[in-house]
Structures are given as structure tokens and as C-alpha cells.
Amino acid sequence: MSVEWNNPEGGNPIAKGWWPYEQSGYMIDGLYRCGIFLRDSVLMQLGSDNVGYVLSHPRANGMLGPETLGENQWAFSVFARTLLAYYDYTEDDRIPVLLKKHFSALNDTLTNRQTCIIESMCKMYSYTGDKEILQKAGHIWDLFSMNGGTKDNEVFIHGDMVSSKPIDVHGVTAAEVSKQPLILYLYTGRQEYLDAALGSILPWNGKTNFQMGYRLHMKACFLSMRKRCMRPVISVTLYGVTVTC
């Protein structure tokens, strides 16, 4: 049986680790968005039920998600995409309020895939204009990557990213973490973020191998649920950053 983010009563098991919530987060996000475009009430209800339970059961410190996750932000970063899709479709005003409390409760010293919560922080900033959220997102990345980075930083030291130092790390980690500075660049305009993002991509394909058609599409720029149209998609190529509408 899949572990959902929904009510543990009624047969939904409680996982002891973080990875079942990561996997169910992917599943719920995909099925909910699919339900919206197909107007499938069953799939939409799956998303709504999980979102509703998470929003109505915040922890004492304001963080969202099951207590068993502790401060693990990677699994929540995956599920947060469902929260943002739900907000985009319903404009449920609980989401910006509760996500702000969640972000405020975060430890500043997040590392590696935990930093992927930056994606949702920046997206919520785009909705609300709350500069405190954006500033904290930047602060989390700066502590993790800048000035030599943290001791447990796997391969995302700023200087190494800019210089395109070859990396040896889990593929999902490489893809998810390396896009965070690009997302920050979109909302802050800080050149050092763009330099890090572009530099980190080159080792994946080789400096002359982009003719194979590789493009990195930002998950942060997702489909607009309300307007039924495509938001601009940010693509990274050897030739720079392009926007596809």
C-alpha cells in the first residue's frame, strides 16, 4: 500500500523513513495535475484529500508534514509542488499563510537536497511578494554553497560550480540541487547564482556535447492550473537561458 500524506487512519500506513513520502509526493503531484487537466474528479480528490490533511495538521512549531519526517525538507519539497498546484488552481488562502509559517520555522543550515525547499519558497514569493521568504531562501543557499560551503556539502560549493568542476553524485541530487541557484537568479537577479547554475550543468554533457539536444526545464515554472495555459518554461542550453511560451 502506498504511503500518502493523508490521514493515517483508515489504512494509510505511517512510514518510519523519509523516502516513502518522497515517492508518494511525486505520485500525488502528478495525479492531481493530471486530474485537473482531464477534469477527473477521482484524481483531483486524491490531491485535495492529501493537501487538506496536511494543512489541517501543522506541527506545534508551524512546520507542515508528518512528525516522522523531522526536519527533512527533501520529501516535503516534493509534496510542496502539490500545495503550489492546489493554490494555483483553487486560490485557497490557507496555503500562503501556512507555508509562511513552515518557511519561518526552517533551520537556515539546510544541506544538499534539503535546500530544494528554496524552489517552493521562491514560488510562494512570486505569489505574495513577501521579501522575508525570498531573503531566507537566498540565505539558506548562501550558507550551504558560498564561502567554501558547509562541511557536508556534497558537490555544490559555489567556486566548484562556477568553474564546472566534474561531479560524482546521485543523479536526482545533481538535477534538483543545481537548479536552485537558477531559481534564485530568476527572482533576485544576482549574477553569482546564474554563474553557479550554468557552470554546474556543463560537466553533465561536456562543453561541446550540447548538440545532443539536452535542455534543463525548470520545474518551478509549471503549468498554470487556473488559466489552462503554459507558463514560460526556462531552458538552459550552452547558448544561454531561453524562455519558451
Kindly label every feature range from the protein language model.
Residues M1-C245:
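Glycan-recognition and catalytic cores of secretory/periplasmic carbohydrate-active enzymes
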